[in-house]
Amino acid sequence: FTAVSDEARAKNAYYTSQESHERYQGLTMWTPTVNIYRDPRWGRGIETYGEDPYLTSRMGVMVVKGLQGTNDGKYDKLHACAKHFAVHSGPEWNRHEFNAENIKPRDLYETYLPPFEALVKEGKVKEVMCAYNRFEGDPCCGSDRLLMQILRDEWGFDGIVLSDCGAIADFYRDYGHKTHPDAESASAAAVLSGTDLE
């Protein structure tokens, strides 16, 4: 993945010299996807490293280190982004309203969280993307438990938390979670729970 980040750096330098700042020209890579692939009906399973939390952790850490480089210079080479935090492994068709409410603590800590923890602690990933789905009733991008208690307090993550595309709007949209009445309350909940960017 070092070659990928070298190319991204070169591409960014070229577009910056042209004063162009469009999509796919920046230095944030929305990868790796370290969700656990448990159900073959999940259409995005091919983006993951499989069903094994340990293997997913090892692969994810290497991707992050390859993309971000050694971090020994004045500037970051680029930012890798661990996604989709957390408990997101399908179903794809209702991901904007799905509530992962039957996850036992042991399954959470032994299956779903280890890859993210490894990327934060070992890989020093710069960004984490919160998922569309809910966890225990709260949208992941508005979950104090996930974003503040686990990610920031337990693991010491001090990077950027960004939402998946449009995930904050899912807090109040009719086809979403309907946990908040409007955009203002949804945005406030996301920020107060630890989401930095939409």
Placement of each model-derived feature along the sequence:
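Glycoside hydrolase catalytic-domain context in secreted enzymes
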Residues: 1-198
